[in-house]
Amino acid sequence: MATYLVGDLQGCYDELQLLLETVQFNPVQDKLYLVGDLVARGDKSLECLRFVKSLGAAAQMVLGNHDLHLISTALGIKKVSLQDHVEAIFTAPDFVELIDWLRHQPLLVHDEKCDFVMSHAGISPDWDLDTAKSCAREVENELQHGDYHYLISNMYDNQPDRWSADLQGLQRLRYSINVFTRMRFCYRDHRLDFACKASVEKASQELIPWFNLDNPLFKVQNLVFGHWASLVDTPTPANIYALDTGCVWGNRMTMLRWEDKQYFVQGALKDYF
């Protein structure tokens, strides 16, 4: 049995299949973890959704910002982005089933046996692991059982940009969503920045990658995330695994076999823009 973790798919279905062939993935005995953003700018978002769903217990994903945006467009809250290629999802006979399945996916996964925590964008520099799990569950409960239409309608905002244990209701949920699905840089006082998507080398000196801030959790816990394609080839601490290497941007898709920490890469097969 092997455990594989793969970066953002963004509709790059063929590259995923080639990676799975390379590692000889066997869903009967292996497990595939996906850091989110199954859909968006690649041309096979529908195939990505169907495939991951078909794997059942052999796959585990976390929700990314593009996955949440797809749910939003399915609800009629937002329009499809001009850069996204998700039209086939909306005309698919299993459209409703796929969106319902997606809505029931988590924001955070803690594999205690393998000893890693996975989310799409990261974990707040102000959270310990218990707080991160609790905040993830709060959002997941609303998405899966609560008034998810109201939540999705009101998640598009950059505030609050700083954690407080006193945050309640929509403010608390929105902060958690932004941390789990949108965060990249923070200020030294731990405020979230949403403007900069650049590499660490090109960012303002006042901005710090979330994983480089002072949080005891970041020093001892294996953390796996995607979302930040411009981090490609940027060194991270030994226990921090950044898996989005920008396949949809013409770079490559990266898969990590957890047991021996071996990486497998597949270059983009086409220009998606």
Curated annotation (Swiss-Prot):
| Record carries keyword Hydrolase | yes
Keyword flag Metal-binding: no
Record GO terms (molecular function): bis(5'-nucleosyl)-tetraphosphatase (symmetrical) activity
- Read off the InterPro entries from this record: ApaH, Calcineurin-like_PHP_ApaH, Metallo-depent_PP-like
A Pfam match is: Metallophos
Quote the function comment for this protein.
Hydrolyzes diadenosine 5',5'''-P1,P4-tetraphosphate to yield ADP.
Matches recorded under PANTHER family: CYTOCHROME C5, PTHR40942
This chain belongs to the protein called: Bis(5'-nucleosyl)-tetraphosphatase, symmetrical
The scientific name of the source species is Histophilus somni (strain 129Pt) (Haemophilus somnus)
Supply the gene name.
apaH
